[in-house]
Design a protein with these regions (language model features):
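Short glycine/proline/serine/threonine-rich loop/turn segments at secondary-structure transition edges
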Residues: 92-99
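Short beta-strand segments within Ig-like beta-sandwich modules, predominantly Fibronectin type-III
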Residues: 75-79
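Beta-strand/beta-sandwich contexts
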Residues: 19-69, 98, 109-130
Length: 130
């Protein structure tokens, strides 16, 4: 009887592995939608200014898109597929210089077998702090 149980378990394990239940392959993410930044409003501020509400105009922004200020994601308000807004704090306007502004459309999650979309980042535009 014990030999029969071992044979059944061995056969079941072999069947499961042959059917692919022992491991799964994953599908890599497909490219996401690349956003395009066309304008920053305003595109400059004076050093020492108080916070500035920045409007980023462009195309292909998804509802979870984020504005990146000097490479770091900042709290973003989605207005439409063509417009996003964010507040630039006083500390980021304290000294003169420039800030690269981009937009990232985050990717979608991958399921058990992969898939989803990858995150995509827009072209860069320059915000000037005079």
């Amino acid at each position: 009887m014990k030999t029969l149980q071992i044979m059944l378990l061995t056969g079941l394990a072999a069947f499961a592995l042959a059917c692919g239940y022992g491991s799964h392959s994953t599908t890599p993410p497909t490219p996401g939608t690349v956003p395009n930044v066309t304008a920053l409003v305003p595109n400059n501020a004076n050093a020492g200014s108080t916070k500035v509400v920045l409007t980023v105009n462009g195309t292909s922004f998804n509802s979870t898109a984020t504005i990146n200020w000097k490479g770091a994601s900042i709290t973003t308000t989605y207005v439409s597929g063509n417009q996003l807004m964010a507040t630039i704090p006083d500390a980021d306007l304290a000294t003169s210089g420039t800030a690269a502004v981009t937009v990232t459309n985050p990717g979608t999650g991958m399921g058990l077998y992969g898939g989803g979309t990858s995150a995509e980042t827009s072209n860069s535009m320059t915000f000037t702090i005079n």
